């Protein structure tokens, strides 16, 4: 009989191990659960480090000059992250099997179903019940840390790569409420999500009557840029026709397929500047680039990622790139409208003195040129009713530099 029992154990070693695990004393089960929780904590730490390495590889790969090393590093870290996540799933299953985390407990009103320790008449179960209580709390803490790590990774991705839409660009309701309250106190309108180009253009023309807004497809804008005269004349009859020029045409029933082709928005202030905004994808309200040019410039370099030959507009373009990223950080609902309204604040680029030093012209340290205030505050101008509230700064006086 003993020989038969030994042969059965040799034939089913896995089943024997499971039976032994189930028959372990409570202290040993708790020790195993705590060890698995420690393993989960180490895996979570590896996941957080891997997320930072992936972000670093993505940032290096986005630079103009880079080798294949960032791509190899990204692939290696991606495989490592997948393995860590798989290990974390296996540890979680083991914790569920040991009774630390169970579906029945998590489905109750208490998030993790943690109960007060059981007190038996002889007091034998008291210590084990307390240890199980602590193990359950540690399991909940491990899951919370994982959730926080994934949230930190998502926040960093949205900060450094805002063009990657993960569907999570929604502000908390409390934050929106506070922002709305501050805007109303400062004489500004409450934020509204402008979902279509006609709505944005109509609202902009009402607030800034002096601006001329035109929209184009990418090919039409290329023809328009190449046909612009190299003089101060800005007669639209000398260039190719835009898709539409006025919001009245939009409201009169512009076809949807025409709007879907709009990829370039031109804001023009006669004798001041011309701003080019690119939309990606075409027909959306998601800006991805912006550039400023002189009204007398023309050529193929006039596009949203180009640079003017004049220092003034080149400096404004560099500053506009920062403002664009700021507006995109608040979601695509108001990013385009806020950007266009901020661009209109440069109508006083050659007449408004610096808010900090009070002078109109000052020496720019980087370029060694005498320039007007080329920075406009964008942090507090999401939906202002009056563009005069937008403060002007020289680059040396700008709050962004300080």
Curated annotation (Swiss-Prot):
The keyword DNA repair does not apply. Component of the Mediator complex. Its main location: nucleus. The keyword Cell membrane does not apply. Pfam families: Med27 (PF11571). This is Mediator of RNA polymerase II transcription subunit 27. The gene is MED27. PANTHER family: 34 KDA TRANSCRIPTIONAL CO-ACTIVATOR-RELATED, MEDIATOR OF RNA POLYMERASE II TRANSCRIPTION SUBUNIT 27. Component of the Mediator complex, a coactivator involved in the regulated transcription of nearly all RNA polymerase II-dependent genes. Mediator functions as a bridge to convey information from gene-specific regulatory proteins to the basal RNA polymerase II transcription machinery. The Mediator complex, having a compact conformation in its free form, is recruited to promoters by direct interactions with regulatory proteins and serves for the assembly of a functional preinitiation complex with RNA polymerase II and the general transcription factors. Keywords: Coiled coil, Nucleus, Transcription, Transcription regulation. Residues 1-30 are annotated as: Disordered. InterPro entries: Mediator_Med27. Residues 1-23 have a biased composition (Polar residues). Residues 28-49 form a coiled coil. Belongs to the Mediator complex subunit 27 family. One of its GO terms (cellular component) is mediator complex. It is found in: Nucleus. The lineage of its organism: Eukaryota, Viridiplantae, Streptophyta, Embryophyta, Tracheophyta.
């Amino acid at each position: 009989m003993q020989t038969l029992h030994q042969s059965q154990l040799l034939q089913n070693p896995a089943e024997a191990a499971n039976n032994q695990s189930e028959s372990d004393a409570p202290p040993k089960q708790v020790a195993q659960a705590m060890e698995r929780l420690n393993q989960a904590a180490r895996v979570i730490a590896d996941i957080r480090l891997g997320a930072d390495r992936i972000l670093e590889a993505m940032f290096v790969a986005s630079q103009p000059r880079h080798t294949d090393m960032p791509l190899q590093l990204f692939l290696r870290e991606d495989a490592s992250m997948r393995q860590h996540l798989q290990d974390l799933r296996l540890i979680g299953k083991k914790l569920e099997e040991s009774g630390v985390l169970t579906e029945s407990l998590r489905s109750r009103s208490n998030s993790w179903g943690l109960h007060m320790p059981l007190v038996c008449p002889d007091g034998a179960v008291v210590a084990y019940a307390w240890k199980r209580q602590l193990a359950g709390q540690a399991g909940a803490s491990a899951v919370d840390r994982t959730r926080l790590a994934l949230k930190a990774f998502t926040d960093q991705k949205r900060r450094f790569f805002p063009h990657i839409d993960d569907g999570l660009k929604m502000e908390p309701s409390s934050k929106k409420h506070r922002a709305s309250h501050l805007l109303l106190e400062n004489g500004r309108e409450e934020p509204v999500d402008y979902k279509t180009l006609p709505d944005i253009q109509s609202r902009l023309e009402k607030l800034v009557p002096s601006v001329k807004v035109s929209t184009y497809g990418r090919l039409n804008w290329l023809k328009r840029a190449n046909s612009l005269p190299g003089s101060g004349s800005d007669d639209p009859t000398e260039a190719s026709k835009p898709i539409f020029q006025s919001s009245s045409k939009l409201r009169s029933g512009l076809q949807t397929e025409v709007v879907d082709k709009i990829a370039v928005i031109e804001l023009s202030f006669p004798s001041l500047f011309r701003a080019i905004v690119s939309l990606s994808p075409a027909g959306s309200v998601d800006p991805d680039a912006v550039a400023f040019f002189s009204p007398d410039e023309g050529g193929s370099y006039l596009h949203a990622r180009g640079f003017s030959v004049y220092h003034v507009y080149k400096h404004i373009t560099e500053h506009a790139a920062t403002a664009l990223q700021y507006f995109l950080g608040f979601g695509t609902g108001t990013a385009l409208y806020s950007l266009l309204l901020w661009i209109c604040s440069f109508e006083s680029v050659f007449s408004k003195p610096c808010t900090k030093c009070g002078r109109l012209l000052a020496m720019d340290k980087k370029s060694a040129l005498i320039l007007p205030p080329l920075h406009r505050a964008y942090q507090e101008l999401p939906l202002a009713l009056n563009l005069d509230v937008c403060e002007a700064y020289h680059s040396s006086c700008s709050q962004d530099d300080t």
